[in-house]
């Protein structure tokens, strides 16, 4: 079971904040397709992932993780069709647009809005520890149709390098270290956030 401070391991951190009881709001959650934060780090760097691909991946991972917790959702594609005429720049700023629409037209009791701030794969075929994979994303849950902010969580993890070694010890440490991909890190974050969300019921 996860605490509200961090997930079960002490290296994959999730910070969560509850603003009001959220139990009834989890009856049917509409998941908004994630978007890239304006400070997104990924495609601007070697080893980076284009923001449209990163947001698509994280949206899918979070959706599947929430479903695995037994929480009913409004399918992402159904949500996207319902809001296809809403200007994206406006909608991500004003969650009220999502909450009202999802609550009144899709039967949602809440909406989950997410943004990806970093989605970067490791760089360097032989020494990825110098530039390890790193992922940051955050989610906010709003009550539908009223739009009240209920809960938020932020996941931030960069794989640390192995302990400093020298000579043959360095080679052995590199072989023992499993260099995570951004996809693997994001999966851990999605599962941790979904677990926290389920615990908050």
Model-derived regions, located:
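Short, solvent-exposed, polar/charged sequence segments at loop or secondary-structure edges
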Residues: 73-122
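A structural "domain/chain start" motif
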Residues: 7-84, 186, 190-201
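Sec-dependent bacterial lipoprotein signal peptides
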Residues: 1-5
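Outer-membrane beta-barrel translocator domains and adjoining extracellular loop/strand segments
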Residues: 125-130
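Short secondary-structure boundary motifs at beta->alpha junctions and helix caps
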Residues: 142-194
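A short, structured loop/turn motif at beta-sheet edges
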Residues: 23-27, 103-110, 141-151
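Hydrophobic core residues within well-ordered beta-strands of beta-rich domains
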Residues: 110, 133-135
């Amino acid at each position: 079971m996860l605490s509200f401070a961090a997930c079960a391991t002490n290296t994959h951190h999730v910070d969560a904040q509850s603003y009001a009881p959220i139990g009834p709001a989890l009856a049917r959650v509409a998941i908004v397709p994630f978007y890239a934060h304006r400070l997104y780090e990924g495609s601007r760097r070697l080893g980076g992932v284009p923001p449209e691909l990163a947001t698509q991946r994280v949206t899918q991972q979070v959706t599947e993780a929430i479903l695995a917790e037994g929480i009913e959702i409004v399918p992402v594609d159904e949500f996207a069709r319902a809001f296809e005429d809403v200007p994206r720049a406006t909608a991500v700023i004003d969650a009220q647009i999502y909450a009202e629409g999802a609550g009144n037209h899709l039967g949602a009791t809440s909406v989950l809005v997410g943004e990806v701030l970093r989605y970067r794969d490791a760089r360097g075929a032989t020494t990825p520890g110098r530039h390890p994979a790193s992922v940051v994303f955050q989610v906010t849950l709003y009550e539908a149709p009223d739009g009240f902010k209920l809960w938020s969580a932020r996941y931030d993890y960069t794989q640390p390098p192995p302990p400093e070694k020298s000579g043959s010890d360095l080679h052995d440490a590199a072989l023992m270290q499993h260099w995570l991909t951004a996809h693997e890190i994001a999966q851990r974050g999605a599962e941790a956030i979904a677990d926290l969300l389920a615990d908050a019921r």
